[in-house]
Amino acid sequence: MEAIRQFDTCNIANAIEKFGIRLRNEGYTRPGLQCVTGGFPRLLGYAATARIRSSDPPMTGSSYLDRTDWWVGIQSLPAPRIAVIQDLHAESGLGSVVGEVHAAVLKALQCQGMITNGTVRDIPAVARMQFPMFARAAAVSHGYTHIVDYGQPVRIFGLEIRPGDLLFADCHGVVSIPHQIAAQLPDVAARIRVQEQRIIDLCQSPEFSTEGLLDAIRTTDQGN
């Protein structure tokens, strides 16, 4: 599985298309998600899902640190893990989903990072932990953030994610990787990258010609 990490999400999305197992406009997030902790990290792991509310107070308790049962749910999934948290009031993003304390908890639970459609905070401190956070934006306060449930399907920027889904995230967004083809993807992605590099090299060469470009494209099409 780690061989996937040498590629980016664009390479992997192209490779998935070759198997024809889903529509080309499915299986990835829509625009708006960003890595707020900076850099260009690549997250690869199994989704540990939860749903929270940040705008309204919970019926009992005060925050989602009051709910420790979801930690057991996280640990029931294979590692490496990615915490995937849907804010049911994400349009306002009133309360931060994760900050420094909970990032430390999630990292201790072998989560490689987290993904949310909501907001996060304590960004410099979490960045120093090397715990990537992919979110809509930053927020000052956690507001009334509390867990509604966990271990259920969530929806993040148009992508439906189920517990245990294999996810790959980078600066472009998140792509969901079908388990049945995961082992084959690195080889397919590598072939595509070689084919694309031929075209790029030709375009940057003093020997460039449109005839040569058409030949390179035909060769690429024949190899697909």
Locate predicted features.
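Feature captures the catalytic cores and cofactor-binding loops of soluble hydro-lyases/lyases
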Residues: 1-163, 177-224
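C-terminal binding/interaction regions
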Residues: 167
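Channel- or pocket-lining gating/hinge segments that regulate access to a cavity or pore
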Residues: 173-175
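Beta-strand-loop-alpha-helix segment that lines the small-molecule cofactor/substrate pocket
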Residues: 170
